[in-house]
Design a protein with these regions (language model features):
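Cofactor-binding beta-sheet edge motifs in enzyme active sites
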Residues: 1-162
Length: 162
């Protein structure tokens, strides 16, 4: 993990004084670090860029690894930004995509994926970027606004994704 953290810091340009968010995760024998750049006007938040560093052992197919990291980031962002199921009178209110708003490709920020070169046994890349993405963005929002997101999706805390 230490190597992933060092590379993540260098690749993202993170240094003292930057207002960014960070989170790291380990699963399926894979290390992932996410650095998030956001901008905000009040509680209107824009995700400018995600920097993802992954160490999954020998990178057998780098294009697939990048795609999995990007897709996992999208899934994690969806949970943070807008995935919400509500109920009324014991029934789910979201019955189709006109009432349930998943993250769309047009909502995705720029994503930079750095794959760590390694001689270790190849490991899983299907899900490890999901868990740290939301927390990295939430930490970036805190760094920029001084307010913590305490409920998901972030609209529950009064924030809006723009």
């Amino acid at each position: 993990m230490a190597n992933v953290l060092k590379i993540s810091r260098r690749r993202s340009g993170w240094n003292k004084g930057n207002k960014r968010g960070f989170a790291a995760h380990y699963s399926y024998k894979t290390f992932v670090a996410v650095v998030a750049d956001v901008s905000a006007t009040g509680k209107q938040v824009h995700i400018d860029k995600l920097h993802i560093t992954v160490d999954c052992g020998v990178p057998v197919n780098p294009d697939v690894i990048r795609a999995q990291m990007e897709g996992g980031a999208g899934y994690g962002l969806g949970a943070l930004l807008r995935n919400e199921i509500t109920f009324a009178k014991g029934q789910v209110e979201q019955s189709n995509f006109d009432t349930y708003l998943p993250l769309r490709i047009s909502d995705m920020p720029e994503i930079d994926v750095e794959i760590v070169m390694s001689n270790e046994t190849p490991s899983g890349v299907g899900e490890p970027s999901v868990p740290p993405t939301g927390p990295a963005v939430a930490n970036a929002i805190f760094a920029v606004t001084g307010e913590r997101i305490l409920e998901l999706p972030m609209t529950q805390s009064g924030f809006q994704f723009v």
